[in-house]
């Protein structure tokens, strides 16, 4: 018997394993479920090895879209998705996704092939200083020096991506490592890293925050995507209802408390921000999205209570009255404890609530009037009114564009947390289809039956439109709505277009924001086997969307034509719309 064991041990000591398989096993050990990428030399074997272990590999048409998809998986699941890219240009294409993940604080792992070690500084194929280049866009960027170190580096990258403020990490894999063989007994896989530690705010600071809130006459809660990521929906909703507090979600904070909740004051956004005397920030940064917390968008003496997981974020742009460093859900529960001990409410019949309700009613009436217009082509409000009428309550909404995203945000409701993905903190165009693919995969595995509605401006669709083939290849029942105004911000109708081109060439005549009028984007979908609809009227929109929602077997694209000069309703403040056009 001892001789048999010795023989088995001897056999195992001679067993070899490739670098590709070590990478795949190390990722599997860290509970990585999804990998997106564009394969080629030298990373194809890594994708194949990952599939052998049950990691889902989704081949995309561009590294940028692959990186966007992987980062969205990180946000939706709390575990990083992996983006696999080839060396040099392949990695460069992924930098946009890495930067976007870091700016949005989403966990992401990028694995990039690189030139062989023995060819360094010789002008090797696609040679580039990749580790150094990625440091600007990541929390951690490293290259294992041996195959044996790969599991250590992968565990550290996964842990770094989810601990503290989440973000992107990069792992550089030399081409010769992929096929290089190592003794199987020399590889020591690291245990799956533990979930991120949950930190709580100082008790004295929590008491101070509760005291400031009790003294408020015009309180406001702002719910950011940090609250969504920390799964704080139950605690924040309880706080909202128990204290009768008005709340305003940021774009990806929508759904933490449902948009149709009576305490949601999204329709009175500007008035709420400008008039509040105490504002509690739940995982929301005072960046451009919230106008930096400064006048004239806010009162000069407004008091901020800032809750964030990242200490460096506290106090940016304004000095908070109270800072609460910790996990958003944990700190929300700490605040609830204070109001459980000594109940308090913002009076529902207060002048503050009356002011907000009046402004909401006024703004909603304007939007309703715009939505009810019968003229053709349709305007944005008419389109989104009819979409909202049929939108399933549990839908994932992915949105990008200019007016398409801004108006859609106000009219398309989210009722569940982590069910809205958009251009985010970085204002990134081109994310839409990658995000939609990620959401569809996560929905399929974790919440079967939930639909993904991807709402794109026609310009935004152009950034990653070829990912329609990816959607069809994996048969993801995504519904794409391309809101088509023939341009970036605004375009021209076909008659005006023809007149412009009659006397001069397009390069000197066509305004920079114009796109080809009446482009049939729905044919991109039908070319790959999905369903496409060319929509001009409310009746056609209702019919085609109803059919798309009923058919769960194929992806669909609705190309919705609107008035080329359609725009937003008049705004109290011109937010990102300063232009002389």
Curated annotation (Swiss-Prot):
Single GO BP term: phytanic acid metabolic process
Start and end residues of each stretch annotated as Thiamine pyrophosphate binding: 404-487
Primary localization: other
Pathway assigned in UniProt: Lipid metabolism; fatty acid metabolism
Gene disruption phenotype: Mice are viable and fertile and show no abnormal phenotype. However, upon dietary administration of phytol, phytanic acid accumulated in tissues, mainly in liver and serum of deficient mice. As a consequence of phytanic acid (or a metabolite) toxicity, deficent mice display a significant weight loss, absence of abdominal white adipose tissue, enlarged and mottled liver and reduced hepatic glycogen and triglyceride. The presence of an other lyase, probably HCL2, can partially compensate for the loss of HCL1.
Entry-annotated residues carrying N6-succinyllysine: 354, 361, 368
SUPFAM superfamilies, per the entry: DHS-like NAD/FAD-binding domain, Thiamin diphosphate-binding fold (THDP-binding)
Catalytic EC class: lyase
Binding-site list for Mg(2+): 458, 485
Phosphoserine carried by residues: 4, 6
Catalytic reaction list: a 2-hydroxy-3-methyl fatty acyl-CoA = a 2-methyl-branched fatty aldehyde + formyl-CoA; an (R)-2-hydroxy-long-chain-fatty acyl-CoA = a long-chain fatty aldehyde + formyl-CoA; 2-hydroxy-3-methylhexadecanoyl-CoA = 2-methylpentadecanal + formyl-CoA; 2-hydroxyoctadecanoyl-CoA = heptadecanal + formyl-CoA
Matching Pfam families: TPP_enzyme_C, TPP_enzyme_M, TPP_enzyme_N
EC number: 4.1.2.63
Co-factor note (free text): Binds 1 Mg(2+) ion per subunit. Binds 1 thiamine pyrophosphate per subunit.
Placement of sequence motif Microbody targeting signal: 579-581
Disulfide pairings: none
Function: Peroxisomal 2-OH acyl-CoA lyase involved in the cleavage (C1 removal) reaction in the fatty acid alpha-oxydation in a thiamine pyrophosphate (TPP)-dependent manner. Involved in the degradation of 3-methyl-branched fatty acids like phytanic acid and the shortening of 2-hydroxy long-chain fatty acids. Plays a significant role in the biosynthesis of heptadecanal in the liver.
Family classification: Belongs to the TPP enzyme family.
NCBIfam families: PRK09259.1
Protein name (Swiss-Prot/TrEMBL): 2-hydroxyacyl-CoA lyase 1
Native organism taxonomy: Eukaryota, Metazoa, Chordata, Craniata, Vertebrata
């Amino acid at each position: 018997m001892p001789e048999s064991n010795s023989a088995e041990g001897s056999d195992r000591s001679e067993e070899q394993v490739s670098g590709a398989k070590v990478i795949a096993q190390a990722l599997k050990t860290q509970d990585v479920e999804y990998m997106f990428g564009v394969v080629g030399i030298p990373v194809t074997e890594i994708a194949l090895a990952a599939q052998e272990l049950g990691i889902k590999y989704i081949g995309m048409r561009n590294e940028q879209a692959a990186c966007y998809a992987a980062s969205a998986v990180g946000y939706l699941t709390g575990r990083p998705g992996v983006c696999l890219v080839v060396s040099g240009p392949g990695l460069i294409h992924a930098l946009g996704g890495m930067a976007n993940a870091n700016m949005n604080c989403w966990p992401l792992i990028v694995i990039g092939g690189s030139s062989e070690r023995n060819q360094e500084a010789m002008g090797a194929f696609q040679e580039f200083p990749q580790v150094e280049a990625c440091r600007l866009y990541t929390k951690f960027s490293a290259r294992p020096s041996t195959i044996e170190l790969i599991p250590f580096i992968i565990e550290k990258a996964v842990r770094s991506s989810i601990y503290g403020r989440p973000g992107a990490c990069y792992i550089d894999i030399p081409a010769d490592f992929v096929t290089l063989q190592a003794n199987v007994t020399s590889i020591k896989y690291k245990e799956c890293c533990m979930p991120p530690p949950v930190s709580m705010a100082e008790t004295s600071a929590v008491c101070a925050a509760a005291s400031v809130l009790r003294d408020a006459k015009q309180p406001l809660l702002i719910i950011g995507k940090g609250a969504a990521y920390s799964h704080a929906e139950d605690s924040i909703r309880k706080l909202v209802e128990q204290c009768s507090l008005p709340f305003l979600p940021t774009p990806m904070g929508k759904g933490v408390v449902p948009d149709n909740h009576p305490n949601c004051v999204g329709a009175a956004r500007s008035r709420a921000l400008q008039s509040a005397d105490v504002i509690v920030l739940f995982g929301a940064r005072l960046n451009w999205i919230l106008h930096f917390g400064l006048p004239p968008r806010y009162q000069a003496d407004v008091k901020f209570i800032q809750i964030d997981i990242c200490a460096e974020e506290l106090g940016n742009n304004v000095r908070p009255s109270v800072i609460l460093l910790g996990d958003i859900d944990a700190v929300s529960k700490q605040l609830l404890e204070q109001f459980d001990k000594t109940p308090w409410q913002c009076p529902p019949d207060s002048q503050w609530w009356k002011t907000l309700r009046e402004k909401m009613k006024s703004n909603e009436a304007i939007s309703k009037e715009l939505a009810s217009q019968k003229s053709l082509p349709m305007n944005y409000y008419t389109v989104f009114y009819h979409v909202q009428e049929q939108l399933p309550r549990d839908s994932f909404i992915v949105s990008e564009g200019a007016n398409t995203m801004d108006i859609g945000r106000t009219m398309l409701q989210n009722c569940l947390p982590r069910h809205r993905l958009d251009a985010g903190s970085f204002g990134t165009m081109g994310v839409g289809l990658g995000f939609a693919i990620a959401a569809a995969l996560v929905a399929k595995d974790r919440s079967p039956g939930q639909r993904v509605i991807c709402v794109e401006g026609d310009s935004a669709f152009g950034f990653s439109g070829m990912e329609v083939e990816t959607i069809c290849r994996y048969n993801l029942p995504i519904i794409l709505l391309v809101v088509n105004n023939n341009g970036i911000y605004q375009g021209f109708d076909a008659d005006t277009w023809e007149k412009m081109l009659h006397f001069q060439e397009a390069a000197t005549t066509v305004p920079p924001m114009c796109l080809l009028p009446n482009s049939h984007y729905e044919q991109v979908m039908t070319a790959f086997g999905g369903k496409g609809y060319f929509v001009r009227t409310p009746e056609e929109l209702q019919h085609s969307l109803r059919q798309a929602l009923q058919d769960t077997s194929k992806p669909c694209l609705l190309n919705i034509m609107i008035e080329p000069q359609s725009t937003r309703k008049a705004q109290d403040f011109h937010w990102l719309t300063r232009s002389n056009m």
